[in-house]
């Protein structure tokens, strides 16, 4: 390799010499290596670079990436929708649905078909994914031109954020606090908590959270009008408040199912309880909402609200025992449990009943009312003659069929009894003739003795004696105040007991009856109806009872139809027709001749006054 000649004093000469040396030795050597680059002050290099045809290998310009995430999202959605389109041919709305939407969005919200929404699915992207609103929008291809339609339920950021909250254990706390923040009153202060979802009520207060659109509320109004006497709907800050007075009573489960079936609501986002019926602040809250201009109202205001807000109703809510006793007498109620229940149910329309429910000593009031009713009824019945009493019992059974009495006559003939002797025994029985006031129905089993006797005793509102309680000193206490009495299925043991201890009772004379916690009371023995399988007329040991009883024999089996029903139907209405038909034959007098212008068996304890609503 040739040595390089270097001269620092003259740069140009060195350059020329180097080129000469290189050219001279190019043929003899394989390559020429330049170890250093020489600096030069000239501009020849720049000019040569401008004339070069080699492009830059590195681009240092700023590069804009673009919204690739939005594009990927759009492509993913388009691919997914394409797969769904191939599987479900009804995915795209038909032109008919679009025409209905163009005519009226409200009309499109009302449909008789089941609204089948898309099932929830897991998605990689949500609407609040952080993509800026100014990102590139990818238009969705459609075979038909777009048209305005009804509100479509799309997942909203508020729905996505609140869904875990409504699924948590604290959802009720959040819902109660949200309701109080919006309406200024707690939901529990205006409603009664029902622990069971099966308990029914006619009035319901429903609060729905973040569920409905305006078109759905209009559809609700149309559908609820068919089921409710009164409805109120108010949409305020994401909470829809319903006050519903249904035509019939419904349970919480039924209310939830209706909203779920028609509008696909989630039960976790709803509260439902009946309103408070005896709470003035709650009534004023609803009254203020109903009288306002906001919300949707339909129908007359419920009575449970009017009764608490009207002045006249508040002024008359003072309890009077006499009014309760009068009501019990008019409705023929004297059992304590029935008195308490029926009078409590009357609270919606009667001020005295509402005042009764506000009392703290309701058991004592019910007991006193039952005692007073029993005293009044006993005294009224004791004052009546037998004609007045039978007429009252006929009136209590209402209008009778004119020909139903024939069933009694045909049954007696079927058993071989002559009608005239039976009428004589009935005459003595009703008029309480001494030694002729005990009617005995005797015969084998299954001959209709008890059926016949119970029908007559029930019509006369008689009492029942059970010999099974003869070990007690008070087993004869039902005889007090009774117009007749029934002893069913008497055996030889009873007849021996009656022969020793009850001869005066069978005679129909005055007897002394021992009652619990009372002194023995003297009263006249009522007429008796006795059914038995023992014919004491053929036994000499009962000769003292044979003159005190009137026997009627039933020897044939009781006739039945093919379906098991009695051939001769005998009940209270049949006896009503019987006594009306043979009134004169039984020597019963006209009630108007004995009453002296007064209706027997009635009493007026207080003067009823009409109150006008202010």
UniProtKB/Swiss-Prot annotation:
Motif range (Nuclear localization signal): 88-90
Amino acid composition bias (Basic and acidic residues), ranges on this chain: 13-25
Name of this protein: Replication protein E1
Family: Belongs to the papillomaviridae E1 protein family.
Signal peptide region: none
Catalytic activity: Couples ATP hydrolysis with the unwinding of duplex DNA by translocating in the 3'-5' direction; ATP + H2O = ADP + phosphate + H(+)
Subunit field text: Can form hexamers. Interacts with E2 protein; this interaction increases E1 DNA binding specificity. Interacts with host DNA polymerase subunit POLA2. Interacts with host single stranded DNA-binding protein RPA1. Interacts with host TOP1; this interaction stimulates the enzymatic activity of TOP1.
Keyword Cytoplasm (UniProt): no
SUPFAM superfamilies xref list: Origin of replication-binding domain, RBD-like, P-loop containing nucleoside triphosphate hydrolases
Lineage: Viruses, Monodnaviria, Shotokuvirae, Cossaviricota, Papovaviricetes
Binding site for ATP: 443-450
Regions of compositional bias (Polar residues) in chain numbering: 136-146
EC number: 5.6.2.4
Molecular function terms, GO-annotated: ATP binding; ATP hydrolysis activity; DNA binding; DNA helicase activity
Gene name tied to this protein: E1
């Amino acid at each position: 390799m040739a040595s390089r000649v270097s001269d620092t004093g003259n740069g140009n000469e060195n350059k020329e010499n180097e080129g000469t040396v290189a050219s001279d030795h190019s043929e003899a050597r394989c390559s020429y290596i330049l170890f250093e680059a020489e600096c030069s002050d000239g501009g020849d290099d720049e000019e040569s670079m401008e004339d070069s045809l080699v492009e830059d290998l590195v681009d240092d310009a700023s590069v804009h990436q673009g919204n690739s995430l939005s594009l990927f999202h759009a492509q993913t959605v388009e691919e997914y929708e394409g797969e769904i389109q191939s599987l479900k041919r009804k995915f795209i709305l038909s032109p008919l649905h679009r025409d209905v939407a163009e005519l009226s969005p409200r009309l499109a919200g009302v449909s008789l078909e089941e609204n089948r929404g898309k099932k929830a699915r897991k998605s990689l992207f949500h609407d609040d994914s952080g993509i800026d609103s100014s990102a590139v929008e990818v238009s969705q291809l459609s075979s038909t031109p777009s048209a305005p339609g009804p509100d479509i339920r799309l997942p909203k950021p508020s729905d996505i954020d609140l869904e875990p909250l409504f699924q948590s254990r604290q959802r009720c706390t959040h819902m109660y606090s949200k309701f109080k923040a919006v309406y200024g009153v707690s939901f529990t202060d205006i409603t009664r908590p029902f622990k069971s979802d099966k308990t029914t009520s006619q009035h319901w207060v429903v609060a729905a959270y973040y569920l409905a659109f305006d078109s759905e509320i209009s559809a609700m109004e149309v559908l609820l009008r068919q089921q409710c006497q009164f409805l109120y709907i108010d949409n305020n800050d994401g909470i829809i408040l319903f006050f519903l007075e249904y035509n019939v009573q419904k349970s919480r489960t039924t209310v939830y199912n209706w909203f779920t079936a028609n509008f696909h609501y989630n039960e976790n986002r709803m509260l439902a309880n009946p309103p408070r019926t005896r709470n003035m602040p709650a009534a004023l809250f609803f009254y203020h909402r109903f009288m306002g201009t906001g919300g949707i109202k339909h129908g007359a205001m419920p009575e449970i609200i009017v009764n608490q807000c009207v002045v006249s109703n508040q002024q008359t809510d003072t309890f009077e025992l006499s009014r309760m006793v009068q009501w019990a007498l008019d409705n023929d109620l004297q059992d304590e449990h029935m008195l308490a229940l029926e009078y409590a149910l009357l609270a919606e329309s009667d001020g005295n009943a509402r005042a009764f429910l506000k009392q703290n000593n309701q058991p004592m009031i019910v007991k006193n009312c039952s005692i007073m009713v029993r005293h009044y009824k006993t005294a009224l019945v004791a004052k009546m003659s037998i004609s007045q009493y039978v007429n009252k019992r006929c009136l209590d059974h209402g209008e009778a069929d004119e020909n139903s009495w024939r069933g009694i006559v045909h049954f007696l003939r079927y058993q071989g009894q002559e009608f005239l002797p039976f009428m004589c025994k009935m005459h003595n029985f009703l008029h309480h003739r001494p030694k002729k006031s005990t009617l005995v129905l005797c015969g084998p089993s299954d001959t209709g003795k008890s059926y016949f006797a119970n029908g007559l005793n029930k019509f006369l509102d008689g009492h029942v004696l059970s010999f099974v309680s003869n070990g007690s000193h008070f087993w004869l206490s039902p005889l007090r105040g009774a117009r007749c009495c029934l002893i069913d299925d008497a055996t030889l043991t009873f007849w021996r007991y009656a022969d020793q201890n009850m001869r005066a009772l069978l005679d129909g004379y005055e007897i002394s009856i021992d009652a619990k916690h009372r002194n023995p009371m003297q009263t006249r023995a009522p007429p008796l109806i006795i059914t038995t399988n023992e014919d004491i007329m053929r036994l000499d040991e009962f000769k003292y009872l044979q003159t005190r009883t009137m026997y009627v024999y039933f020897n044939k089996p009781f006739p039945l139809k093919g379906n098991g029903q009695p051939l001769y139907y005998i009940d209270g209405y049949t006896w009503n027709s019987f006594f009306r038909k043979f009134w004169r034959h039984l020597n019963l007098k006209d009630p108007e001749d004995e009453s002296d212008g007064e209706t027997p068996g009635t009493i007026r304890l207080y003067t009823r006054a009409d109150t006008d609503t202010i």
